[in-house]
Amino acid sequence: MLLEPVMMKIEEVILESSLVRSFIFKTCSERSESKSLEYQPGQFIMLWIPRLDEKPFSISYHGKDFFGVTVALKGRFTQRLHEMKVGEWAGIRGPFGRAFNLGACPEPQGCRACVVGGGVGMASLAVLIERLENSVVVQGARTASELLYRNRLKYMLLCTEDGSAGTNGVPTDLLEDLYRHYRFDAIYTCGPEAMMVRVLEFAREYNIYMQASLERYIKCAVGVCGQCCCNGLRLCVEGPVLDGGTLEKLEDFGRYARLGNGCRVTIGTYLGKKT
């Protein structure tokens, strides 16, 4: 874990959609002391642009000497990041947070998992999907042009709200039929919180182990400032991945989050703020 920013070079920029780009960083270079980034699916890094700010991003690509983050264009920080080119440098610290539990099943070797992703939430799930040996994956987006990793993750069921690709609807519309066919033992999800609330309800109804990766405003990433607290849980340390039993106890899940100034607002207001 890197507790202080280490400068790393952008090796590749991947255009995932018109508003989403992935930035691949080399972890071993003449200006970086790090030879590898020890990481488990679901963890995140803090990315620092000098003289601007630092923001958290899920690791969406990972290899022996590289890693990547997937970034949606939202505000001033992400605008600047989208303008960065191959050969430019950014400060990286981490990875931080609790990862997905790949050994959640009683018999992991025969475990069948269902992965439910929505929008840019797929970034938290991409490496997880690549490491799961036996899974069915559902991805949802508003329209076909917003679906991510279609060439990279070839075996996915797709949903779009406008019907432009795959099933017309949202990923949770498919859960009943998928469970009848696949009888999965665990569900992993990341995306819009309303979608994850429905996944939690489904998992409770069918007594299926589930984990969700939550998004909150993360500032220090080490559990000191309390900015990312959700009903007392510091999501940068105790999360961002939480299991169903924990989510059931969180009154704020699906309802409230905190802005950068600490104000508690509705999820809709929180997601509407640009970063």
Set out the residue ranges of the language-model regions.
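Short, charged beta-turn/beta-strand-edge "cap" motif at the junction between a beta-strand
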Residues: 51-54, 94-99, 254-255
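FNR/FR-type flavoprotein reductase catalytic core
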Residues: 76-219
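Local cysteine-cluster metal-coordination motifs and their immediate loop/turn environment
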Residues: 124, 193-194, 215-240
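Short Fe-S-cluster ligation motifs
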Residues: 231-238, 242-275
